[in-house]
Amino acid sequence: LKENSGKADCAYEEIRKRLETASVVGADETGATVGKHLHWNWIFQNDLLTYVFQSESRGQKAIDSKFPKGLPYSTLVTDRHQSYFRMNVKDHQVCLAHLLRNAEYLNELDPNQNWSRRFIQLIEHSINLRREGNITSRKIKVLKTKMKNLLGESLTHLDNEFEKFKRGILKVKDYLFTFLSNPSVPYDNNASERGVRKIKIKQKVSGCFRTDGGADDFAKLHSIAETAMKNGNSKFNAILAVVQQ
């Protein structure tokens, strides 16, 4: 890895630059052991590009090190990690799959209430509108009004987890239904989650990264290989082209 890492710099930087001008980008992060320390592998990706990097930070410092100007042309699809919402972006879309899982937990926590079930129904209705291609401005307005009313209900009579969840949703309420107005924006962040899962599998097979440099080198070559695959090319041939420079 170390021997060929420098040869990958140009291609790696080109991927990053193309993401800076992309209209839609998904992002996620996952823990990574480097030496004896906890670091974080970050992924920024879309249908054509994958950019992975590692950092000691799980916050804004890590993002700014690679995207100091943010992603001003992009709708950013993520979970609710606050660092993403401090970025300079065109718009946001919160991963609805995450929210559905959170709400299902509330259903199990208190089966006798119906607040979380109504939340799930609204989210699932929005997804069905997209799938059926049955979106109108009026339907979006009605959906947003129903969500606003639901989030305005008092939950103090329920377990504290309900109020905690509602407060979290209120912070991102403007980014629940972006995907209904922009057909290129997905309503989940599954692609980013799959991307970081591949890195987790690598660690389970081969163990931790021994050094910062090794983790960085892997991120470069992994980004190039994944981007090649997304564009219909061979991962092997992409890495071979880097090595043979």
Regions found by a protein language model. Name each.
Residues L1-Q245:
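Catalytic center-proximal scaffold of phosphoryl-transfer enzymes
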